Amino acid sequence: MSEPIRVLVTGAAGQIAYSLLYSIGNGSVFGKDQPIILVLLDITPMMGVLDGVLMELQDCALPLLKDVIATDKEEIAFKDLDVAILVGSMPRRDGMERKDLLKANVKIFKCQGAALDKYAKKSVKVIVVGNPANTNCLTASKSAPSIPKENFSCLTRLDHNRAKAQIALKLGVTSDDVKNVIIWGNHSSTQYPDVNHAKVKLQGKEVGVYEALKDDSWLKGEFITTVQQRGAAVIKARKLSSAMSAAKAICDHVRDIWFGTPEGEFVSMGIISDGNSYGIPDDLLYSFPVTIKDKTWKVVEGLPINDFSREKMDLTAKELAEEKETAFEFLASA
């Protein structure tokens, strides 16, 4: 057995965490021979609920779970971390402007970034889930100057999985048969789900998605809006935001960081845009197609970008630049 790793989940009394914690504890994310010390952080009013979650994790009697720590104190939560999954954020309330949401979250992620900087291992991998995820991730990274910015990523894997699922449903195959879809940009309704480079396995051979579907107007229209608005559709139907699918996407994202991506396959994640070859401005936290090896991501280079894609990629970059500007004004005054 290897040494236990310390894994933090914030917002640990919430819906997403409730769907996520069992998968982390049972070896689905870090492997079946990796012991784990699981650290659960939430705000003080949630500590009663968190106690219940702690009891349930104990009652799961998971052999890999060496310890579970529930706390509302950052100096305990962020100590010596190997992995931080930042799920907790201020949710958007009715009538709340996106700007107000940004302001509340800048405060949270500035504090958590500073706590990572002060207490966590410098090799910590930080995954931001709480919305607005891209800008929250950038805020945390800026507030943790001693941790390499490449160690920070935000979740667009849920959008990626949603795109795969839509293509699979349309073609009557399983999601497994679809690969190399891309989510460009922000985890918001401006994201651009791109299947120009995606492949699908049909009758044992790989075909381009455009060629397989022969329905360009669906791919350039309804498909894109369905993926962009899927989160809102789930809320409308379930009266709660996506939790099971979000937790599954977090597992996929973190597992790929840990073990790498399969040969010939790429995935989507929000990462720092510095030095990219797709004309996206530097210093944005933008979702790109990446491959991962030895816990290090690399942007997939050289994919041809048509005019339709270019426009969509620039639009979501513009939104991210505006969010960043607003967040940094708050950051300066926070």
From Swiss-Prot:
In-chain residues carrying the UniProt-annotated modification N6-acetyllysine: 118, 121, 298
Positions annotated as active site in the UniProt record: 187 (proton acceptor)
GO CC aspect terms: centrosome; cytosol
Residues bound to substrate: 92, 98, 131, 162
Catalytic activity: (S)-malate + NAD(+) = oxaloacetate + NADH + H(+); (2R)-2-hydroxy-3-(4-hydroxyphenyl)propanoate + NAD(+) = 3-(4-hydroxyphenyl)pyruvate + NADH + H(+); (S)-2-hydroxyglutarate + NAD(+) = 2-oxoglutarate + NADH + H(+)
Entry's localization field: Cytoplasm, Cytosol
Residues that bind NAD(+): 11-17, 42, 105, 112, 129-131
Modified residue annotations for Omega-N-methylarginine: 230
GO biological process, one term: malate metabolic process
PTM entry text: ISGylated.
The protein's assembly and partners: Homodimer.
UniProt record similarity statement: Belongs to the LDH/MDH superfamily. MDH type 2 family.
Protein name from the UniProt record: Malate dehydrogenase, cytoplasmic
Organism: Bos taurus
Taxonomy of the source species: Eukaryota, Metazoa, Chordata, Craniata, Vertebrata
Gene: MDH1
